[in-house]
Amino acid sequence: IAGSTGAININVLWEMGGAQRILHGILEQTKGLVTGVTCGAGMPYKLSEIAAQYGVYYLPIISSARAFRALWKRAYHKVPEWLGAVVYEDPWLAGGHNGLSNAEDPTKPEDPYPRVKALRDTMRQEGIPDELPIVMAGGVWYLRDWENWIDNPELGQIAFQYGTRPLLTQ
């Protein structure tokens, strides 16, 4: 299916103990199998450097344009060719470990559209083309709920990550 490139994308929790060592080990032992690394749960500044070292794409998971800008300015701008996508996990719709600023109320969900538009605007300011997708993750259950995001020039290329709903909650 993937031809001469890998067909596997792995997900690593950045704040997990030993994440960098584990990531190096996985990528060293799976050369040619892994094509991308999705990484969140923290600010994975070194993700781009590690991914580029092994010739795989990096897909950071972020919850705001501000977080992406910090990652881009500090590290990601050095290897933009390996940025595969930006995964946006909404602080209110996705699983609960996403960052909110002190000005945001966790009990008052906000519409994700303005936040994703702000992310795209930031990406454009940094010279990242609209063809590089933003992946909307968390709270995506039905495509019909997101139809106005598809082929929307304000947002550029958009993809959707579907997950499973929690079976047991309090």
For the regions a language model picked out, list residue spans one by one.
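Active-site entrance/lid segments in N-terminal catalytic domains of soluble metabolic enzymes
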Residues: I1-P129
